[in-house]
């Protein structure tokens, strides 16, 4: 899709770069698959900030996405490709042969009028969903389950993809974009092809207000704060005098924080592993 730059009629317009998607549906989403979505403003049930830099933003409705793809052996036709404000990828509205409609994450090259299928006997085409044991080695996949039947958890954002490297017994070997190599059970499902909207990383919002529309508040540097607000705060001039830390005093820039030992055995090569 082409990247369009606006005429510099204002400082905000000067730096904005948009990706144009003329194939996207311009109407309202399918009403039965839409539900209300509130905003927390980054606060918990006590009203305290638990996630910084969150607040405001345009009101949004949540589109109910079918991440499990368990409607097997029933062909579905792509009615339209839509924008979804809740994610970077585009979504596709499917109409199954029995009349039911569902949203899925749209893979790259999926077009209106295409037919998609789920199940073990599905052909290897973009948008089809089948277990890893039925996918040929070397295939590019996305929307991958980590637990059987739980639904897609991995490679769901715009342009994301994973390569199937091989199969060993009950596990498939996957290589992620980050460089990590890990095992996933062969009965877990995945979708053929990479996720749509691959040019998403090329766009430029152009101004701070565009981030505010998305519900993102400003990020203030710790060195610009007072000592009461951040460990980096205070001092005469630009001084910090200590190792970089989070606002709560935990060391940053390299401190390992992963604590999920239960799945350590599934990771063959870590994304931060040093190259030999």
From Swiss-Prot:
Keywords: Ribonucleoprotein, Ribosomal protein, RNA-binding, rRNA-binding
Region (Disordered): 33-55, 221-276
Biological process according to GO: cytoplasmic translation
MF terms (GO), sorted A to Z: rRNA binding; structural constituent of ribosome; transferase activity
Top-level taxon of the source organism: Bacteria
GO annotations of cellular component type: large ribosomal subunit
SUPFAM superfamilies, per database record: Nucleic acid-binding proteins, Translation proteins SH3-like domain
Record bears the keyword rRNA-binding: yes
Family matches, as SMART domains: Ribosomal_L2, Ribosomal_L2_C
Pfam families named in the record: Ribosomal_L2, Ribosomal_L2_C
NCBIfam families assigned to the protein according to its UniProt record, in alphabetical order: rplB_bact
Family: Belongs to the universal ribosomal protein uL2 family.
Function as written in the Swiss-Prot or TrEMBL entry: One of the primary rRNA binding proteins. Required for association of the 30S and 50S subunits to form the 70S ribosome, for tRNA binding and peptide bond formation. It has been suggested to have peptidyltransferase activity; this is somewhat controversial. Makes several contacts with the 16S rRNA in the 70S ribosome.
Subunit structure of this chain's protein: Part of the 50S ribosomal subunit. Forms a bridge to the 30S subunit in the 70S ribosome.
Protein name: Large ribosomal subunit protein uL2
